[in-house]
């Protein structure tokens, strides 16, 4: 075995002082990343599978001269408070057809096939449809959800004034309109949650990387080559990330029955639709460790190039004000392409806006830190301000996911309609709640890992301050202030920036009705402050112990 590989595995087994907490934080954060990535992939594929089973109902581009059937859909009826869809189907080529998905034979005029939920309530519908008993029950192969309410009724013909749709195949690759809308919404959701997830990946890698930075710098100064140092770090991070990915996959599998209860797209999911496939497992087991290793190696760039700078504690160079120019690109693109309803450019625009927040964040933290240091009237404010100025990237990294969640909250606060009976609005509300849940889980994991990482990062300066006579209480208070200030000073403007991007996309229209948007924004602020406060309290013992030696 390669000596550096063996040494890396030994460091995982025996991480040294402070290493166990760092490894556990990195492991837990990576497990959350794997669970979220699996959920997003499986959910997107599940929508595709749901659409494949019912896509033929939306087919309307077939040539009437060659079509196998004509359709007319009425989805405005109700049964026991549930929306009921009635699909009239006229078969144009009865001798050439296999039955539609989920039906045991092609419906003849007067025959009625119903979903299981409708079959349970048929006694109240029999008189209306003139059939005492349904011809058959549609199986799960022909339904988008076990809770779908639909009647497929065979008719002789559909008149032209009903504007029939024409279908050329039951297996035609046509997206159901509702599933397609959900998939587009999921794409926007993925873009919005992507950067918090990437921040969590970076945080997971950074916690362990920061702990090993001085150790690897010492190895570098002792004669280890740059390649050896990077390989050692990659091995250590890959083992932690792979273990976290496995736990995340197992966690998703265990939670699948609960996830299937989410009533999106007209009802709950079939568990089989969101069950992970072998290639999904492979993607997660490869992608999560690779991203984690890359993040760790980027964080150790200083070690491989200037190890003496790490040991001497050299500060990083200042950040350019040019970063703020990125804030303009996203809103302008959203305003321009929002009018054109071009999905891909809009996804890119949302990504640019979120990226701008991530890139501008450290610069804004440094700006706030300079103002704090200049206006400091005590040691706590001065120490906190200098911390933000000296290492703005390090100060922003633990709260990056939280700040980005503010962008997400501000963005979606514009899109919270209150139409109770509209299925699209209902899907939107559930989607917003689901997106916020994913973001909050990401933020909680990132903040927890960041608390440990920040404590270990500040161990050396805190140790020096304690030796020079600075009280531990002052050091801990300064650390808490340095954690809260980026959330307030940067996070609140980012919430407004997110709302601005949402308004740019909607053409300046506020889709949200009532006070739900304001309550959502207030909830974001309160949740953010609570998370940072709890994280600071959790990180204090780690800082106290790490700076004691």
Describe each model-derived feature in a short phrase.
Residues 1-37, 64-66, 115, 159-170, ...:
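Hydrophobic multi-pass inner-membrane translocation pores used for secretion
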Residues 4, 201-218, 222, 451-464:
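Transmembrane helix boundary and interhelical loop/hinge segments in multi-pass membrane proteins
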Residues 7-12, 39-190, 196, 408, ...:
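Extracytoplasmic/periplasmic regions of membrane proteins
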Residues 184-192, 277-290, 431-437, 520-529:
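Hydrophobic alpha-helical transmembrane segments
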Residues 187-204, 438-445:
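Long, hydrophobic alpha-helical segments
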Residues 202-205, 241-266, 282-305, 487-512, ...:
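Small-residue-rich transmembrane alpha-helices
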Residues 239-352:
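Hydrophobic alpha-helical segments
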């Amino acid at each position: 075995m390669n000596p550096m590989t063996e040494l890396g595995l030994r460091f995982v087994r025996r991480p040294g002082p402070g290493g166990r907490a760092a490894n556990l934080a990195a492991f837990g954060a990576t497990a959350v990343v794997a669970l979220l990535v699996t959920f997003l992939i499986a959910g997107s594929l599940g929508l595709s599978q749901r659409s494949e089973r019912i896509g033929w109902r939306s087919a309307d581009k077939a040539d009437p001269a060659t079509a196998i059937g004509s359709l007319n859909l009425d989805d405005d009826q109700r049964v026991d408070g549930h929306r009921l869809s009635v699909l009239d189907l006229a078969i144009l080529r009865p001798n050439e057809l296999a039955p539609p998905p989920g039906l045991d034979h092609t419906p003849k005029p007067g025959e009625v096939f119903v979903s299981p939920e409708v079959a349970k309530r048929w006694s109240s519908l029999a008189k209306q449809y003139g059939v005492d008993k349904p011809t058959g029950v549609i199986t799960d192969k022909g339904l988008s959800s076990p809770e779908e309410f639909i009647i497929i009724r065979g008719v002789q013909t559909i008149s032209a004034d009903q504007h029939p749709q024409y279908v050329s195949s039951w297996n035609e690759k046509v997206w159901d309109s509702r599933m397609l809308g959900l998939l587009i919404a999921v794409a926007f959701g993925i873009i919005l949650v992507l950067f918090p997830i990437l921040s969590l990946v970076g945080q997971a890698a950074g916690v362990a990387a920061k702990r090993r930075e001085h150790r690897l710098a010492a190895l570098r100064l002792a004669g280890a080559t740059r390649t050896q140092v990077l390989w050692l770090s990659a091995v250590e991070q890959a083992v932690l990330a792979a273990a976290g990915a496995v736990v995340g996959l197992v966690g998703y599998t265990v939670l699948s029955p609960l996830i299937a209860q989410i009533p999106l797209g007209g009802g709950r999911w079939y568990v089989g639709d969101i069950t992970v496939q072998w290639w999904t497992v492979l993607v997660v087991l490869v992608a999560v460790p690779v991203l984690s290793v890359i993040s760790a190696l980027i964080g150790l760039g200083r070690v491989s190039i200037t190890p003496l700078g790490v040991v001497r504690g050299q500060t990083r160079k200042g950040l350019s004000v040019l970063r703020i120019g990125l804030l303009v690109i996203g809103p302008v693109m959203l305003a321009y392409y929002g009018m054109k309803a071009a999905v891909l450019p809009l996804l890119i625009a949302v990504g640019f806006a979120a990226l701008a927040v991530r890139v501008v964040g450290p610069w804004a933290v440094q700006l706030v830190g300079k103002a704090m240091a200049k206006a400091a009237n005590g040691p706590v404010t001065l120490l906190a301000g200098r911390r933000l100025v000296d290492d703005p990237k390090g100060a922003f990294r633990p709260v990056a996911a939280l700040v980005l969640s503010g962008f997400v909250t501000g963005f979606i606060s514009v899109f919270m309609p209150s139409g109770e009976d509209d299925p699209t609005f209902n899907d939107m509300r559930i989607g917003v709640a689901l997106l916020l849940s994913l973001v909050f889980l990401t933020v909680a994991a990132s903040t927890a890992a960041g608390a440990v990482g920040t404590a270990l990062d500040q161990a050396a300066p805190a140790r020096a301050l304690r030796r020079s006579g600075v009280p531990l209480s002052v050091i801990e208070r300064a650390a808490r202030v340095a954690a809260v200030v980026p959330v307030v000073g940067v996070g609140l403007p980012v919430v407004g920036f997110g709302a601005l991007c949402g308004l740019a996309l909607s053409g300046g229209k506020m889709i949200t009705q009532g006070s739900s948007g304001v309550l959502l924004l207030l909830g974001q602020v309160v949740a953010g402050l609570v998370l940072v406060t709890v994280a600071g309290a959790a990180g204090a013992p780690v800082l106290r112990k790490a700076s004691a030696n």
